[in-house]
């Protein structure tokens, strides 16, 4: 509460409390890590409640610790019906000599306190009392805290049930404050982080979160404080590189900015250097994946430099994988490097147990004996052991695992402890350990590691937040780096709060309070997922401070310049309200401008700077609002090279409703000795009077302040009457000048020699707003293909348009009559009837009229715009296309030749494909009909059709920033011929039904299977012998559809089908036998491909087909369909394929063959539930093959049960289902 609200104190205060309760019994113990500095209480006795008529009262002050405390009372409530009571501390104050007011000695004062406020009845305090408790961080912004509704007024004044007496004893009342002042161990206890300055409080800054990359922020902070690593990064040569495509330079800059910046940084530059687009920046990736890719990229950049191999020295350890025979002296071992370790969390209590599990030996005996060289099958022990750990050890805790029951990734939230210090020697090879810990080094243990980084995830698998806890040096002080903010934390916040939490029984959860439940949920979902340990004996070396001299000079120079530029810009923003920017325009700028309006401006999106051939632009003049108009006008003339003695007029410009920037009215000031601010106020007053009458609207200080904030720039046109076209024509007629067409030379001549030119009585005339109009004229020359400003006219409203035409015809020495058009706005160009007057044609001051230069010879170029209307259309819809040579072709019709890698040009968005191809051919030096053009959007590539318009492949309401890059490919056949071919994607399966390669081809619709295989053989790489054993089949909606053979063509293959191919000797042989069977129409098998509704057919159709080609004596097997699904037969996924059944083969052997062809690992395949669907005379039978003993399954022979095209079903989760089209693999491209 401010001091001006205080009404003086009433009553008295005394130490202690009339309520027989200790502070400890009232205020709960907050935290064992938070020290209590002081606790005390005081009581305010109010002598007569009934005399409290004012809204607010203060108690006398009572000193506790370094503060004087008082109680604020709102007896009638603070915007409510209850009594409001607050507690307020007052820090030590001093006199501010500037303002004469008392101010805190420490402006950043704060006090963390637990407190309670109690009311009690004097004389009966032990029995009649009410106490509420809270806690708060008191500071200069939050000076008081308490209870807005401590007690209802009626309850205060009258007895209630269970309380025979009121709180008032003959009007008196006691209000007691209990205060416990706590030591703030971190500097942020109960902090709301408003106006929090991380750099000021901790000396460190964080990163802004640009999307889903807070895991990147955490990893960068961890690397930044691995100071030896930071020095290595600084030693990579980057002087001649760009941060946009150099990961080392971007990392150097990020690290140095973390050293010197006072504000949080963003990671945009770094992610750009990775080659990531916006989508990748907003995609959740795995921190371990990023860690390894980043290290690999840096390692490559360090090759050939003094720091080559240094990353291995600090981050790479060695482990030995071994198989050791028990009964013979034989061991097979392999030593491998590791950058980090993935440790299991589930079912383990702590880090020690995870390491024990990591090196746990597996016994190989029985059927799993090891085939030892020279010794045959032997019992053996299999495992891994460590030979060395790196100085900086990254441990990835497997908090995220795939759960087959839920068919998705889940987070392991169980409690898992990690120590501050760990001895890893128990996990090291004994022979290595003996050599390391010899007698000379027994005092030093290189396997003792101290924790320095904890990367934390709070949330579940789909949502959450990442932050990191870091101990920057050897000092025992931890900090939390949470995106933009950094603050100190306690040991408990580092360890216990990030262990996770075991799931509690539902019965216990149901008994929790709301606050307890929230804390339980937070604790359970907040856990460490990565730990960074540093070898104890190398801590000082690895964490030695990084000096300015360690940073490359070019990084220091550039970053310092950027900081200075940012500070300058921030200063400009702070002082912007003191200035107005005058954007000055003249006829000289107009005659050089090609485009809509007079010249380019901020509100105009159809202009590109590169189209401004002359380079002339508006002139910006930044002036203080306190500058006198006389000085401003002098500066304008000086800036624009106009002699000071020339008489000019200043026109205000503004945007019309159609967004065109045009002249509005001349600026007329009674005096030039007033300031710009005063002139703006007068202008505002005139405007208000025009809108609201003579009395206008009273101007207030708030209005003036709003004016200061809103009027930051003014567009002004400087009318020079001596450059008006009628005046120029008179000078030409008087032979005072040789031409009347404006150019830079003529403008300069007239400005300089005007007194000499007007001696004969020819005087320039200003356009006045009520008698004449100021019109602007443009000319279009078809020969030069340019539409430029021609000049301006000061014309009477009753003047004929034909008079203007005659003057222009004379200026350009033409005998042909001109046709004029009014440029209303982009897309609206109206022809003007020349017999009308200016008034009748509805042409007003600031309007633009255009004409076409008659008799011009069209140039021998392409494209050509023959008329002014054609050119206006081009201006309205022109776009700049950037082309590159297409390098992603997967088809055989592309040819390579020496053509430019990239080029760019302007063209109309409504250009037909033939015109676009013709433009590309000029740069690619090939015939346009042999070009294929591709629009490259982030979500796909789109090949332009030969019958299309360019606009068909642009976004609706596009602007220049939304034009995609384009690519071109030179074809060996004309595009129109190629378009008659059909695109086909072949998913080629090599060794399994899990992984495939996708190939794209263009084929004719009449292609058969053999023709197609002949076409693709070279690209895929199979032999002639293998070609005979290839099966091609289609799937639709994950269901088998049919086989492709020479009896049908690709015309019969549905566009919605997926085409698969694999070398399958057994299945291919059976299929050929089926084709040879008498009285069997092979086409019936392929009918599945012809029917686009095949996926909707019931199983009986396929069974009928199978029975139609039932086994005969010539058959040596059967073909069945394998279908994948999860839980429900309709929930299909994966590839549906054919599989052969062998006579007399038992089910376990059939299952082994299916496993080998399917391709999953033994562990994963064992989780698949198999069942069959087969046809009988009674109908289709579905039978599960689960729950049978091995002896029972040995008696099952599928060949005897199933017919051709019956089904084997595989019930298992779809491992790719959760991978959307946006889940792209992580890659650093630069």
Curated annotation (Swiss-Prot):
Reaction equations catalysed: Thiol-dependent hydrolysis of ester, thioester, amide, peptide and isopeptide bonds formed by the C-terminal Gly of ubiquitin (a 76-residue protein attached to proteins as an intracellular targeting signal)
Domain MATH positions: 39-179
Family to which the UniProt record says this protein belongs: Belongs to the peptidase C19 family.
Pfam families, alphabetized: MATH_2, UCH, USP7_C2, USP7_ICP0_bdg
Active-site residues, record numbering mapped to chain: 214, 465
Stretches assigned to the USP domain: 205-536
EC number(s) on file: 3.4.19.12
Reported consequences of knocking out the gene: Cells show oxidative stress-related import deficiencies and growth defect on oleic acid. Peroxisomes are clustered. Cells display defects in peroxisomal import of proteins containing a C-terminal PTS1-type tripeptide peroxisomal targeting signal (SKL-type).
PANTHER family named in the record: UBIQUITIN CARBOXYL-TERMINAL HYDROLASE, UBIQUITIN CARBOXYL-TERMINAL HYDROLASE 7
Record protein name field: Ubiquitin carboxyl-terminal hydrolase 15
Binding partners and assembly: Interacts with PEX6; promoting association with the PEX1-PEX6 ATPase complex.
Keyword Hydrolase: yes
SUPFAM superfamilies given in the database record: Cysteine proteinases, TRAF domain-like
One GO biological process term: regulation of protein stability
Keywords: Cytoplasm, Hydrolase, Peroxisome, Protease, Thiol protease, Ubl conjugation pathway
InterPro entries documented for this protein: MATH/TRAF_dom, Papain-like_cys_pep_sf, Peptidase_C19, Peptidase_C19_UCH, TRAF-like, USP7_ICP0-binding_dom, USP_C, USP_CS
Keyword Protease annotated: yes
Primary subcellular site in the record, as a coarse category: cytoplasm
Primary enzyme class: hydrolase
GO MF annotations, alphabetized: cysteine-type deubiquitinase activity
Function: Deubiquitinase involved in peroxisome import by mediating deubiquitination of the peroxisomal import receptor PEX5. Catalyzes deubiquitination of both monoubiquitiated and polyubiquitinated forms of PEX5 following its retrotranslocation into the cytosol, resetting PEX5 for a subsequent import cycle.
Record-level GO cellular component terms: cytoplasm; cytosol; endoplasmic reticulum; nucleus; peroxisome
Further information: Present with 2810 molecules/cell in log phase SD medium.
Compartments, as annotated in UniProt: Cytoplasm, Cytosol; Peroxisome
């Amino acid at each position: 509460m401010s001091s001006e609200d205080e009404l003086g104190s009433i009553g008295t205060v005394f130490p202690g409390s009339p309520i027989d309760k200790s502070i400890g019994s009232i205020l709960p113990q907050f935290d064992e890590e938070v020290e209590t500095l002081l606790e005390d209480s005081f009581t305010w006795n109010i002598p007569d409640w009934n005399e409290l008529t004012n809204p607010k009262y203060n108690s006398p002050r009572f000193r506790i610790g370094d503060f004087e405390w008082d109680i604020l009372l709102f007896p009638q409530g603070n915007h409510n019906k209850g009594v409001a009571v607050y507690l307020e501390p007052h820090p030590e104050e001093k006199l501010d000599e500037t303002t004469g007011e008392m101010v805190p000695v420490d402006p950043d004062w704060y006090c963390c306190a637990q407190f309670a406020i109690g009311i009690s009845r004097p004389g009966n305090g032990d029995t009649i009392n009410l106490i509420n408790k809270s806690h708060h961080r008191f500071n200069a912004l939050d000076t008081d805290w308490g209870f807005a509704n401590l007690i209802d007024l009626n309850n205060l004044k009258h007895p209630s049930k269970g309380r025979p007496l009121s709180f008032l004893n003959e009007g008196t009342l006691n209000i007691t404050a209990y205060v416990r002042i706590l030591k703030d161990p971190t500097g942020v206890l109960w902090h709301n982080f408003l106006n929090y300055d991380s750099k000021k409080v901790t000396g460190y800054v964080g990163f802004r979160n640009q999307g889903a990359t807070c895991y990147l922020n955490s990893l960068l902070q961890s690397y930044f404080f691995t100071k030896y690593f930071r020095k290595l990064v600084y030693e990579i040569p980057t002087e001649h590189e760009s941060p946009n495509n150099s990961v080392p330079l971007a990392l150097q800059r990020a690290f140095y900015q973390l050293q010197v910046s006072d504000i949080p940084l963003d990671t945009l530059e770094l992610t750009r250097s990775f080659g990531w687009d916006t989508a990748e920046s907003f995609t959740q990736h795995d921190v371990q994946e990023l860690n390894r890719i980043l290290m690999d990229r840096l390692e490559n950049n360090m090759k050939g430099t003094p720091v080559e191999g240094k990353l291995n020295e600090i981050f790479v350890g060695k482990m030995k994988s071994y198989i050791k025979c028990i009964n013979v002296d034989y061991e097979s071992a392999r030593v491998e490097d590791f950058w980090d370790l993935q440790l299991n969390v589930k079912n383990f209590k702590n880090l020690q147990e995870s390491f024990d599990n990591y090196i746990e030996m597996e016994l190989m005996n029985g059927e799993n004996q090891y085939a030892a060289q020279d010794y045959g099958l032997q019992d053996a022990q299999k495992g891994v052991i460590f030979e060395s750990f790196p100085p900086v050890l990254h441990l990835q805790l497997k908090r995220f695992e795939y759960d087959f029951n839920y068919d998705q990734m889940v987070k392991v939230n169980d409690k898992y402890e990690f120590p501050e210090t760990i001895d890893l020697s128990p996990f090291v090879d004994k022979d290595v350990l003996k050599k390391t810990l010899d007698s000379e080094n027994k005092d030093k243990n290189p396997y003792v590691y101290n924790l320095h980084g904890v990367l934390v995830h709070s949330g579940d698998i789909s949502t959450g937040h990442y932050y990191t806890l870091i101990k920057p040096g050897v000092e025992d002080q931890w900090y939390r780096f949470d995106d933009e903010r950094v603050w100190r934390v306690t040991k408990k916040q580092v360890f216990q709060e990030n262990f996770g939490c075991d799931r509690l029984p539902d019965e216990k959860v149901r008994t929790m309070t709301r606050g307890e439940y929230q804390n339980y949920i937070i604790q359970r979902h907040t856990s460490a997922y990565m730990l960074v340990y540093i070898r104890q004996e190398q801590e000082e070396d690895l964490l030695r401070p990084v000096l300015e001299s360690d940073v490359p000079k070019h990084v220091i120079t550039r970053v310092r310049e950027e900081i200075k530029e940012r500070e300058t810009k921030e200063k400009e923003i702070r002082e912007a309200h003191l200035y107005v920017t005058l954007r000055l325009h003249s006829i000289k700028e107009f005659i050089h401008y090609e485009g809509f309006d007079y010249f380019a401006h901020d509100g105009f999106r159809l202009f590109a700077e590169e189209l401004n051939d002359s380079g002339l632009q508006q002139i910006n003049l930044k002036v203080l609002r306190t500058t006198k108009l006389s000085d401003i006008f002098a500066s304008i003339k000086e800036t624009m090279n106009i002699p000071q003695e020339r008489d000019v007029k200043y026109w205000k410009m503004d945007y019309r409703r159609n967004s065109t920037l045009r002249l509005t009215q001349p600026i007329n000031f009674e005096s030039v000795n007033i300031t710009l601010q005063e002139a703006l106020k007068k202008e505002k007053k005139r405007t208000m009077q025009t809108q609201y009458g003579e009395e206008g609207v009273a101007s207030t200080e708030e209005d003036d302040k709003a004016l200061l904030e809103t009027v930051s720039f003014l567009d002004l046109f400087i009318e020079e009457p001596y450059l008006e076209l009628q005046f120029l024509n008179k000078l030409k007629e008087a032979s005072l000048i040789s031409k009347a067409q404006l150019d830079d030379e003529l403008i300069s001549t007239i400005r300089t020699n005007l007194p000499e030119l007007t001696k004969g009585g020819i005087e320039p005339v200003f356009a006045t707003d009520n008698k004449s109009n100021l019109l602007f004229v443009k000319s279009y020359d078809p020969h030069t293909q340019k539409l430029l400003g021609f000049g301006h006219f000061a014309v009477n409203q009753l003047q004929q348009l034909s008079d203007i035409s005659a003057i222009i015809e004379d200026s350009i020495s033409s005998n042909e009559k001109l046709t004029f058009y009014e440029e209303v706005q982009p897309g609206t160009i109206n022809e003007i009837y020349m017999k009308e007057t200016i008034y009748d044609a509805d042409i007003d001051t600031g309007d633009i009229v255009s004409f076409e230069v008659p008799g011009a010879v069209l140039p021998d170029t392409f494209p050509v715009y023959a008329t002014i209307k054609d050119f206006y259309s081009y201006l309205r819809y022109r776009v700049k296309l950037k082309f590159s040579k297409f390098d992603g072709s997967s088809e055989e019709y592309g040819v390579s030749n020496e053509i430019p890698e990239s080029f760019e040009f302007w063209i109309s968005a409504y250009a037909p494909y033939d015109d676009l191809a013709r433009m590309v051919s000029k740069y690619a030096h090939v015939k346009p009909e042999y070009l294929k053009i591709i629009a490259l959007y982030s979500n796909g590539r789109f090949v332009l059709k030969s019958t299309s318009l360019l606009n068909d492949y642009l976004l609706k309401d596009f602007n220049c920033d939304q034009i995609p890059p384009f690519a071109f490919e030179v074809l060996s056949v004309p595009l129109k011929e190629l378009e008659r071919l059909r695109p086909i994607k072949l998913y080629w399966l090599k060794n399994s039904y899990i992984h495939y390669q996708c190939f794209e081809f263009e084929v004719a619709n009449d292609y058969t299977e053999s023709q197609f295989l002949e076409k693709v053989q070279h690209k895929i790489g199979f032999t002639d012998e293998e070609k005979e054993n290839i099966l091609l089949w289609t799937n639709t909606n994950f269901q088998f559809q049919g086989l492709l053979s020479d009896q049908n063509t690709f015309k019969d293959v549905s566009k919605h089908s997926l085409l698969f191919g694999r070398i399958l000797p057994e299945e291919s042989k059976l299929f050929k036998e089926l084709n040879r069977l008498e009285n069997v129409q092979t086409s019936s098998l392929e009918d599945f491909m012809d029917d686009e509704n095949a996926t909707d057919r019931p199983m009986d159709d396929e069974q009928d087909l199978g029975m139609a080609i039932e086994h005969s004596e010539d058959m040596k097997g059967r073909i069945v369909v394998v279908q994948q699904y999860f839980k429900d037969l309709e929930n299909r996924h994966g590839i549906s394929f054919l599989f052969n059944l062998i006579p007399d083969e038992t089910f376990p052997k059939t299952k082994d063959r299916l496993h080998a062809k399917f391709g999953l690992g033994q562990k994963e395949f064992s989780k698949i539930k198999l069942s069959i669907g087969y046809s009988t005379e009674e109908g289709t039978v579905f039978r599960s093959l689960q729950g049978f003993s091995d002896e029972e399954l040995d008696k099952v022979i599928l060949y005897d049960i199933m017919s051709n095209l019956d089904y084997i079903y595989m019930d298992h989760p779809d491992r790719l289902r959760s991978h959307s089209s946006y889940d792209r693999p992580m890659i650093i491209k630069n």
